[in-house]
Amino acid sequence: MHSDAAAVNFQLNSHLSTLASIHKIYHTLNKLNLTEDVGQDDHQTGSLRSCSSSDCFSKVMPPRKKRRPASGDDLSAKKSRHDSMYRKYESTRIKTEEEAFSSKRCLEWFYEYAGTEDAVGPEGMEKFCEDIGVEPENVVMLVLAWKLDAQNMGYFTLQEWLKGMTSLQCDTTEKLRTTLDYLRSLLNDTTNFKLIYRYAFDFAREKDQRSLDINTAKCMLGLLLGKIWPLFPVFHQFLEQSKYKVINKDQWCNVLEFSRTISLDLSNYDEDGAWPVLLDEFVEWYKDKQMS
């Protein structure tokens, strides 16, 4: 009897312990919101329902949006943007290449006027002046010749052309046209003007002569001083009636100095100064002309 009672007590205690554990688990799950009332029958029978893993995940993370496939319009817009960017790139690249100086292009440009020769001659020079929109007698052509360091009037050799045009970064007619204003501006600088004036003497003279013939001298003086020296008309008149057939380089250089330093009434001219006889005679002739 005693052993039977003990066995009953043991089984009873085991059931109670199991019920206590189940009750504890139920309360724990309830705190975690993992249980729900699923109707009166479930409540009465004490049954439990835990949420599935997908239900729990949806409470934490928002639903993922599905990516829609690109429409035909979107693809067309992307292609249009790509084409536009490519055209812009190509336009910039081509423009850069055109702006960059090219020795090859400069050489081809030279032979447009030189033909099969190694120098641009009178005929080619005439066409060249026509293309850049400048008369051959325009002073800017003298400045260009100076920049090219041309040695003979009416001619540009291949070496002079390549060296000078490279320094100017001109390899086409269009580029030189846009450079003409710069070349003209060099005449406004006192130092550059003096260099160009001195260069003009050697450029214009016959290479087997040390002096410049009087007719060429009058033309070159008119080109350089005609618009900036008020006394040039009377000086030109003096040369016309004088006995001089040529002008040497010393006389040439002193004419520029005279035009810059001597007043229009010649009152500051020193007859005992180191002026050439040519200018002494001009001053005397001009004063006599004023008195008569």
Swiss-Prot record:
There is a cross-link at residue 95 (Glycyl lysine isopeptide (Lys-Gly) (interchain with G-Cter in SUMO2)). Residues 40-83 are annotated as: Disordered. GO terms for cellular component: nucleus. The keyword Ubl conjugation applies. PROSITE patterns: DCUN1. One of its GO terms (molecular function) is cullin family protein binding. Residues 47-58 have a biased composition (Low complexity). It is found in: Nucleus. GO terms for biological process: positive regulation of protein neddylation. Keywords: Isopeptide bond, Nucleus, Ubl conjugation. Residues 102-287 form the DCUN1 domain. It comes from the Eukaryota. InterPro entries: DCN-prot, DCN1-like_PONY, PONY_dom. Highest levels of expression are in the testis. Very low levels of expression in other tissues such as the heart, brain, kidney, liver, lung and ovary. Interacts (via the DCUN1 domain) with the unneddylated cullins: interacts with CUL1, CUL2, CUL3, CUL4A, CUL4B and CUL5; these interactions promote the cullin neddylation and the identity of the cullin dictates the affinity of the interaction. Interacts with RBX1 and RNF7. Interacts with CAND1; this interaction is bridged by cullins such as CUL3 and strongly inhibits the neddylation of CUL3. These CAND-cullin-DCNL complexes can only be neddylated in the presence of a substrate adapter. The DCUN1 domain, also known as PONY domain, mediates the interaction with different cullins. The DCUN1 domain mediates the interaction with the N-terminally acetylated NEDD8-conjugating E2s enzyme leading to the NEDD8 transfer from N-terminally acetylated NEDD8-conjugating E2s enzyme to different cullin C-terminal domain-RBX complexes; the neddylation efficiency correlates with the DCUN1D5-cullin and DCUN1D5-E2 interaction affinities. Contributes to the neddylation of all cullins by transferring NEDD8 from N-terminally acetylated NEDD8-conjugating E2s enzyme to different cullin C-terminal domain-RBX complexes which are necessary for the activation of cullin-RING E3 ubiquitin ligases (CRLs). This is DCN1-like protein 4. It comes from Mus musculus.
